Amino acid sequence: VIAVAGAVDPAAGRHHQREAAEPVLPIATVAAALRQFDVRLDGIDIVSAATEPGRSIWVVLRMDPQRNVAAVAARDSLASTLAAATERLVHDLDGRHCQARPLNAAEITDMDAALLAGLDPDQIRPHWRYLKHPDGHVTSFWVSPPDITGDVLDELVLPDTDINVVTIRLVARRGGIDVSAIVRYHSDERLPKSVWGGLNRLTGRQLAAVRASLPVPAAGRPLLISSRSLGEDEDIVVRLAEAEPAAPTYSPAPVGTSL
């Protein structure tokens, strides 16, 4: 897992300095990391969590060791292989109008807690179109493939919700890369249709949608949603916060619980 934030411009404030470039995360740069020398990643998720204090963004690399036997053997362990792939992507991202750094195990646990946003699996009541819990409602939607653009991704952040979690999934396919996106809203009340009218319901798959945004793979069937091919000339970007990702304010779920 990689944490990404806007780069700090050392020349900021200098006289006659040109306006600094907007900090962004180019999806094409992330997608290129799906194929790295002898390593083939199954997918990469770009996960963002927007709250009132700010926005945190992470990049999650996913790899099937059975498809990378030679690479794992050459490095003696699965952990070393995935760490090498992560470091390569960090190198490609860091300094290009953004800061990138790999997370340690404790930080991944904090990320997991931040994305759950206080959800306790024991207190969730699943409904067909939303999840109910003591603090309100959690509702997930999938984005129509043609709508996966930079402008639409920016519009997914709603100011009247407690937290917005957007997951952009990049998956390697024969001959190309597929992109899909889901969004999750935490709110006090059920969301009116005027808010989500351009999105698609995940009927009966609300728990699976929450699992799909977490860094640690969950047991059970993966969430399958519609995707499209990512064009080689597409310049979709994710706008970044100009500061380091905010520290999570939520506590991890009790040990032994899972969604």
For every predicted segment, state its role.
Residues 38-44, 97-102:
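Short secondary-structure capping/junction motifs at helix and strand boundaries
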Residues 25, 39-42, 74:
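Charged, elongated alpha-helical coiled-coil/linker "stalk" segments that transmit conformational signals
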Residues 1-4, 55-63:
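Short coil-to-beta-strand
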Residues 1-31, 35, 50-52:
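N-terminal topogenic membrane-targeting module
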Residues 42-60, 68-70:
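Structural flexibility/helix-modulation signal
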Residues 60-259:
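Membrane-proximal, solvent-exposed terminal domains/tails of membrane-associated proteins
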